[in-house]
Amino acid sequence: MDRTEAMPHFMTHVVKPARVLALMRLEKDFQTHKNTLATNWTNDFQRICNQLGREQIRKNKPLLGHLTFSLLRTELAVGRAIYVVEATDSSWFFDRNPCQTEYDASWALRYLNQMKDEIDSGRKAYMRAITLPDVEQIVLREAVHFHQYVIQLARYALPTAIQSPEFAALSTEDVVEIRVGEYMDVSEVVYKIDRRVRDAQSVREWIDEGSEQEYAYEVFDRLDLSRGEYSEMDFRYSRFEHSDLSDARLNGCVLLGTRWNHSRLVRADFSYSLLFGANFDHSDLSGADFGGIQASKGLLEPDSWEMPGFWEISFAESNLSKASFIDAQLAEAQFRKANLAGVNFAGADLTNANFTDAHLREAVFVGASIASADFTGADIDGASFSVKDRDKLNLDERQQAAVLWIEAEREEAYLHELFYPVSR
């Protein structure tokens, strides 16, 4: 086999399997230890802020507008998983005097080294058609996949890390973007601060313009956006904290990683939206519609890798009374201490969902997938479950006696009426 034939064969039969194996290992590590990783990331972030703060004073630097973590391929080529961290003013790339320090991402890029070992071992079967320099070049190209986990961890950790006194001590603009990318190349916002006082009406008018790209990674905190029509829009990774979106229509939206903490969302319509990794903790969602949403934790396809998996959607300590989650995908969702009285979960995937200490009186679980769901301490008086799921539920004696068990015939009739209603 000559080199022309060998390289495509090598990429398909050695590199691709090694990539998938390494990324699946990294995915498992990230999902299992993400809270520990986030704590370590926050500690690094505090150290970075301290160093940048000293640099800012030494250089008599004006207000900072951007904090950018950039992968250095030159460092990667010599085995170091180093990102340069630059604090710049509002001019960003045009700031000729940035404050700089470093971030070590070995926790993620060590899996790239494992992949390198795998493909270096695999190249030997190709004799001299695949060389060590070929492997080095392939590894540098493959780094982009592992780099995505650095982006994902920053997104996960920053809502907490940003509260640190070390960051507060920096002198910053009213609008600050924290970004992760490659050096002098494409980067993306992982957290944005916007302290400007904005008028709700002007924000509504801006959204009404309907730009396809402008609403992702945005800040919509402390605004009255109630009764708005926002369906089929892309708000990925935006924040709506302490805001009012009661009676708003957000069905069919891209809402990945959005944050809605401490907001009023009464009767809001989120049906059929993508809500992977969203956070609704401490919010009022009574009567809200989450029917058909996609929000399960993990990879989009459990047996293949296309992008990093999402963390779980969370409704901890929220009011969801009379809300609807019919046919929603909610594997590993967090409902800890939430008010879920009268909620309809019919047909939903609630595998490994957490309902500890939740209020679930008269909630409907008929036709739902509830394997390994945790109901410890939950009040489930009058809640209805499919009788076929009795052995799958880990309920105490009081809970077992308090629920309604729906027989198969009644379940089938109920679900048929719910999903295939007949006009009368």
Language-model-detected regions and their locations in the chain:
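Acidic, proline/glycine-rich low-complexity IDRs
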Residues: M1-F10, R141-M233, Y237-S238, E407, ...
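Short N-terminal edge-element motif at the start of the domain
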Residues: P17-P62
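Elongated alpha-helical scaffolds
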Residues: P62-Y83
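Short, flexible loop/turn elements at secondary-structure junctions
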Residues: L71-E75, D89, E182-M184
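Aromatic/basic-lined ligand-recognition segments
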Residues: I82-L109, V203-R204, D208-E209, Q213
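Compact, glycine/acidic-enriched structural inserts
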Residues: F94-D134
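Tandem repeat scaffolds
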Residues: V197-R424
